[in-house]
Structure formats: C-alpha cells, structure tokens
C-alpha cells in the first residue's frame, strides 16, 4: 500500500511511523537497566495482587494519597512522570517490576512472623507485602495461625507461596480472646527461638500497612539492640506520631513503648517470652509485656515516624469502620528508599541520659543530676536514697531556654491540670517551647489536646519530647522526672510515710485510721498512694505467687488472696489512679499512711463511673447508708 500510494499518502505514513517510534522510545525510558541503578541491585518480578492495599501518602491525610502518587501513563511522556531511584512501579500485564536492594543483612538468622487467626485476605495481603520487601530473601518468613481449623476451606497450604512456612497453633482455650492471643504469642516465640533457632524476630499483625524500607531500618537498629543490655526490643510504631516532627531519622527510647511491629533478639526472648503457656490473664499480652519490661527496668527503641500503620477495615484488629479512631490516619513512612539512620550511639542509655540532662542542667550540675537520674522511685520509697534537694534548688528553667536558643519569654511552663492555658499557648505564635509539668492524675485531660496516646507512651525516665503546631513540647512527670525539676515543681514521696497492707474489704483510709494513736495521727493521701501503685512495691509486701497483672479498678494496688481466677496475682494499673476510701471483699490493698503534715499537692484523680457505683454498694454493705 505504501509503494502504490501517492506522495501525500507516503508522507502521512512516514509521519505516523516517526510518531510511533518516538512514543516507543519515551516508554522505554521508563524501564530501568542494571546500569541505571548500579551493580548492587537487581530487578525482581512479583505477581500483581489487586487485593494488596495501596500505601497512603504517609502524612496522616487520606486526601493526599492520590496527589502524592507518581502516575505512569502508557504511551505518554510527561515531566511529572519522573523516576525516583529505588521507587518504581510500571504497569505491566500481570506483573509488577520492583527494584530490590541486594545488600546482605548483618543479622545471622532473622525471621519474620505474620501472626493471624481467620482473616484469609488480610493474611495473604500481608504475606505478599512482606515478600516484596527489599532484602527479604535473607529472612525466613512464617505465618502463625491461631485459628487454623477456620482456614482449611481456603487451602492455606496450597495458596501460600513456597517461600513461607505455616505454623499452626491448635489451642483448646478459646475464651477470653485476649488469653487465646497471649498463648498464641508464647507458642510462636518458642517455635521461632527454640525449635528453629533464629537469632532475631520481627512480629507483624495481619492488618498492618508496612513501609517498604523496614528491613533496612531493622538491620541498622539491631546493632544498638544487641549492644545495649538495657534494651528489650525495637518497635516500628509510635503511639504519639501525631505529635512528632516528620523526621525519618529520629529515634527514641522509652518505657511504656508501642506494642506494634516488635523486633526481638534472643536476649529479649530469654528474659521475657521463655515462659510456659499462660492459663489465665487479666489483660492482653501487650500490657503484660510492658509490665514485665518495667520490672526489668528495660526499654525499647522506636521511630518518631512509624514504619507501619493500621488499616481501617470491617474486621481490623485495632481499627474498625465507624469506630471514630484516627489510628488509620497516622503518618508513616511510605518511601521505598532506604533511610540512613546514621550513628545510633546516642540511643545507648548513658548517652541518652546525658543528652537529656544537658538540656536542663548547667555544666556545673550535669554530673550531679546524672547521678540523681539513676535513683529510682523505688529507691526513694524504700529509703535507699534521698532526694537531692540542694541540687533541685539550683535548677531553673532559664538554662533550658538558653540551651534551645530562645528567650525565656518564648518558653511557657504549664503546671498540672491547666488545660485552658495549654490550649491558649498552642495557638500563641510567640511561644516556641512548651513545658508541661504533669502527673498521672491529669494525663488523660491533656492527651486529647496534644493528640497523644490515651495512656502514657514513650516516656524515658519521666520525660517525653515532642513537637506540636510547630512548637517544641516537653512533658515532664513530676514524680518520675524529679531530678530535672526545680524544687518547687517536684512531687515528693514523704519519707515519714508508713506502708501497710489492708485486710480484705478494708480501705486505705480505714487502715490509716487503725494505725493512728493518740500521739500520732495518720491519713491516706491519694497523691502519696500513687507512688506505690507499681509491681515492685506489691512484691515487697505480698507473695504475688503468679506475678503482677494489669487492671483498671481504683482499689489498686492489691493482692488477690481468695479462691477466684485471679488468686495469687498482684494487680496495679498505669491507666487509673487509686482512691483512699475504696475496697472490695476479694482483695487486700497496699496502702500508704501519711502524717497530716504531708505536703498537700491537691491532685484529684479521675473517678470512674463504675467506681462510684462500687463505693455506694460498699457503703450499703457497711451499713453507712
């Protein structure tokens, strides 16, 4: 047809061919070669899974997801379709082409476990997301099923990729659900570390979005985990991410750490998880784990910007449709590029403590304050150490302002419970640094304002460093972080206090009245009682045969000595505060009796509705109504 056509026809055909070749060349430019990305990387293919959820923008704003994507349109060249190194996704029929780093991990024998029950689609989506991770070939991947019988109809063995090993936990215990999950975790840890002899373990729940670069993150943080014996784990999550700067290199360490995306070495397993399957628990494994870490005086490392995020679905573990939660909007890192975290020696406990002290104490006091920082609240309660009042009297907020390079007028120190002042300061453009002096009694009133976790998370020895509305924010616990505070701001434990155990159904107020004599009167002070709301103090006075467990009653801290399921447990709580005039028939309270001369701090614990009902019932039972 070309040869027989006239000149105009031949010209038309030539133009079409030139345009076609030009578009073909433009498309080819989207396809990388080994030379484009260096010899240290390879191109790997994965079957395309439409059910795998798309990563979001990572800024906590779902509306920004589409705007942040780079779209690759076949046969259309565009300046907006620029390639990012190690961040490539090309529409290929039934295939996704991905650049994967072939750099070998430094871990000797690491494992990843996706832990799930019966959500087949969630499990499979998680498996495919994990198998796409850069460097996953150096990990052994497992799926641990807590409800294997419910998934037989889905032919899990045949559906699972050959690179994945299935663990089945067939448990006769079905209720309560949090006990079944706790037992599943213990089973899985035994399998990974005892039977398969792995050196490190990453645990992922089946409803999480994961950052493509998490294995590089773990490879770097594992070195500090293995080096520092005061560290128990690394977490990929941050409960306070809404109040953090989007600094992908910044890491923290703290107690009351996040419980998602936990990474352990063998030391962590031996210290915590090498136990028999529990037959009873008052709460979930995560509360138990944090309590165990607190007993051991150990902490975990976690990022300012999470490397995982909750999905929001009909049957998600934590976040469900229409539940009002904002967890699925938390910022998290979605970039496929590995982040060089740099020198992590600042996370070693001594270095971390020194940095914090340097922010608050002048050079002449640093060593003294650092020594005070090693004094625990237990030491103060038990008389093993005393408050260094002389040093506290020399502490002032002017050094903190100077250290931050701001005027004192640009810093605002807010005392406990002053919610209205906090709201006002957050919107004040002239304020660059906010220090909140807090206690457990008032944490829940400030947490929603600052978009913090409902319970205290991420504190290191009573201090928490954040950024809200472009302002640096420091929270200081007036009991735990006493060594950083001026004397007037410390909540002191009174050395004249007397600790006593109560009889069943005896309140702390009644204990203190019983202890009083004609020459010495004692009272129950709720602010002093909060000091002994901890496992270490319960174990001083009760046998606690089955250890400590978490509860939310306001008769805490208590020992259960009657023939009920919790017999032999010592119970305490980090989420609620104890009351003086509360008691129940099945427990014995641990009480603090103070002299009337004790300093009156005036903190008033939040009283739960259930507590008010129980107090009325107790008065009826005692014939006081």
Features from the language model and the residues they span:
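Short, structured beta-strand segments at or near domain termini in extracellular proteins/domains
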Residues: 576-608
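Short linear interaction motifs
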Residues: 281, 489-495, 571-574
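Extracellular disulfide-stabilized recognition modules
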Residues: 488-506
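Peripheral/terminal regions associated with large enzymatic or DNA-binding modules
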Residues: 4-203, 208-489, 608-625
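Extended repeat- or IDR-based interaction platforms in eukaryotic proteins
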Residues: 448, 464, 558-563, 591
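Folded, disulfide-stabilized extracellular/luminal domains of secretory-pathway proteins
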Residues: 500-578
């Amino acid at each position: 047809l070309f040869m027989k056509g006239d000149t105009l026809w031949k010209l038309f055909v030539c133009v079409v061919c030139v345009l076609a070749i030009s578009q073909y060349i433009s498309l080819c430019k989207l396809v990388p070669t080994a030379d484009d990305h260096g010899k240290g990387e390879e191109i790997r293919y994965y079957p395309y899974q439409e059910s795998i959820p798309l990563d979001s923008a990572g800024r906590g704003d779902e509306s920004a997801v589409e705007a942040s994507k780079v779209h690759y349109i076949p046969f259309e060249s565009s300046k907006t379709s620029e390639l990012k190194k190690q961040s490539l996704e090309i529409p290929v029929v039934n295939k996704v082409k991905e650049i994967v780093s072939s750099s070998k991990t430094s871990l000797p024998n690491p494992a990843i476990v996706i832990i799930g029950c019966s959500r087949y689609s969630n499990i499979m989506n998680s498996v495919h997301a994990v198998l796409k991770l850069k460097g996953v070939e150096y990990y052994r991947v497992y799926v641990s099923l807590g409800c294997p019988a419910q998934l037989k109809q889905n032919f899990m063995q045949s559906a699972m990729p050959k690179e994945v090993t299935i663990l089945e936990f067939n448990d006769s215990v079905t209720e309560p659900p949090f006990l079944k999950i706790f037992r599943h975790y213990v089973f899985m840890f035994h399998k990974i570390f005892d039977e398969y002899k792995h050196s490190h373990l990453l645990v992922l729940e089946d409803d999480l979005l994961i950052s493509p670069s998490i294995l590089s993150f773990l490879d770097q943080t594992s070195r500090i985990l293995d080096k520092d014996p005061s560290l128990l784990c690394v977490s990929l999550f941050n409960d306070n991410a809404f109040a953090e700067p989007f600094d992908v290199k910044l890491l923290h360490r703290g107690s009351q750490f996040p419980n998602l995306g936990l990474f352990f070495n063998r030391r962590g397993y031996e210290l915590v998880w090498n136990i028999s399957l529990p037959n009873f628990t008052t709460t979930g494994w995560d509360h138990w784990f944090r309590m165990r870490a607190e007993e051991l005086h150990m902490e975990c490392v976690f990022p300012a910007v999470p490397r995982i995020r909750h999905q929001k679905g009909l049957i998600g573990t934590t976040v469900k449709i229409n539940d009002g939660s904002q967890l699925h909007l938390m910022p998290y890192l979605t970039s496929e590029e590995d982040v060089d975290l740099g020198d992590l020696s600042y996370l070693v406990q001594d270095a971390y403590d020194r940095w914090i002290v340097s922010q608050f104490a002048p050079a002449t006091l640093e060593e003294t304050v650092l020594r005070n920082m090693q004094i625990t609240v237990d030491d103060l309660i038990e008389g093993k150490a005393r408050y260094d009042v002389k040093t506290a009297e020399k502490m002032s907020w002017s050094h903190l302002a100077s250290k931050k390079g701001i005027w004192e007028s640009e810093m605002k120190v807010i005392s406990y419970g002053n919610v209205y002042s906090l709201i006002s300061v957050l919107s004040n453009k002239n304020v660059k640094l906010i220090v909140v002096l807090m206690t457990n009694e008032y944490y829940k009133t400030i947490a929603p304002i600052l978009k913090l976790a409902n319970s205290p998370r991420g504190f290191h020895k009573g201090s928490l460093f954040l950024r809200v509305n472009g302002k640096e924010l420091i929270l200081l616990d007036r009991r735990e972080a006493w060594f950083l505070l001026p004397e007037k701001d410390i909540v002191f434990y009174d050395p004249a206090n007397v600790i006593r155990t109560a009889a069943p159904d005896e309140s702390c107020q009644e204990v203190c009245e019983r202890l009083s004599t004609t020459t010495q009167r004692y009272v129950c002070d709720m602010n002093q009682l909060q000091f002994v709301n901890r496992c270490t103090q319960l174990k001083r006075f009760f046998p606690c045969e089955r250890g400590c467990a978490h509860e939310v009653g306001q008769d805490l801290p208590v020992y259960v000595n009657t023939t009920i399921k919790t017999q032999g447990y010592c119970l305490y709580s980090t989420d609620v505060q104890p009351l003086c005039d509360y008691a129940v028939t099945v427990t014995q309270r641990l009480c603090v009796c103070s002299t009337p001369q004790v300093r009156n701090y005036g903190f008033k614990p939040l009283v739960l509705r259930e507590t008010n009902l129980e107090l009325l019932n107790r008065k009826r039972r005692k014939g006081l109504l």
